[in-house]
Amino acid sequence: EPIAGSFQAGNPFVFTNSALWTLIVLAAIWLFMFGGMKRELIPGRWQVAVEGLIGFVDDMVNVSIGPQGKKYLPWVFTAFIFLLFANLMGNMPFAIVPGGHPFTVTSQFTFTGVMSLITFAIVLGVGFYTHGLHFLSLFIPKDAPLAFKFIIAPIELISFLVRPFSLVLRPFIAMFAGHVLLDVFGNFVVQGLNSFSAPGILVSLLSMFFIIFVSVIELLVAAIQAYVFAILTSLYISEAVNLH
């Protein structure tokens, strides 16, 4: 159910939990970045954290793309920090507003899908703008025999076209699967306690320990998926820039 409005026909405004948490994530990112951009001579911990995060992604982009990587840092860093904050905040165990329970917006296919489309729009734009039709040579191995080129080229093209889907599905599946596990074992806890029996209480305790374990793993997965998306984005852009 939406927090405000309804899905009835003719309703011009519907405010969902997904929209709420998107705004919360964006606000948290803004506060984090604003608080760490003071540029003090002796930086505090907050400034060190922000500068360290930017430096981490900057190094990743420069290593993956090369000297031209600086111009692509804004998008790679934006994707990285949005995924990181969205994934981590979706694991918060409390609600900020009534009816607005924690929600991982990246567990929705549309969010990761749009981010993937932006990445590949950049890849195609950079590739054709920089190299023209020579960009298509990316799909044809230079030193392969002519007979093999007709076989390898379609395979390389299909591999390239599949990349947006893999980029979409990786964070989506990782976060969605973890939340499904938490939901299932959370139900085990409730049902076990409601049974008022020794076996039921035992199941509840075991399920609770498993929930704690999965929650810790989810925090690691949240950071890993943000890193994987950023590094793959850098590598795909590198191929468009350097044609290799």
Which positions does each model-derived feature cover?
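Selective transmembrane helix interface/packing segments
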Residues: 1-244
